């Protein structure tokens, strides 16, 4: 899993890939600096809307994690950014992804 490998290269630990069905939008569970993360990975050809934000927010609670993140190779719609701000969901867009990839080399 590319996202899981990328997290490992960026000093995340206890990385666990969830099952595909029934995961409530959570693809990966991870930890960094004693903070636990529920992460949804989206590899899309268009910007990410607020459905992903709502899913990961729900999934964070289900898995009892500290932080909810949506990681994507794209950007987020204005509505998604507003939703994420209201629900305290971290948005890691293609710029953040690029920074994470640069940490590998």
What does each model-identified segment do?
Residues 1-105:
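Mixed-charge (Asp/Glu-Lys/Arg
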């Amino acid at each position: 899993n590319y996202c899981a490998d990328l997290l490992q290269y960026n000093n995340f630990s206890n990385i666990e890939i969830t099952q595909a069905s029934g995961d409530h939008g959570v693809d990966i569970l991870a930890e960094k600096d004693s903070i636990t993360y529920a992460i949804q990975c989206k590899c899309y050809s268009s910007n990410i809307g607020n459905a992903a934000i709502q899913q990961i927010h729900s999934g964070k609670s289900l898995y009892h994690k500290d932080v909810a993140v949506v990681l994507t190779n794209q950007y987020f719609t204005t509505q998604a950014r507003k939703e994420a701000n209201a629900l305290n969901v971290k948005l890691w867009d293609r710029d953040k992804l690029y920074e994470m990839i640069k940490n590998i080399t």
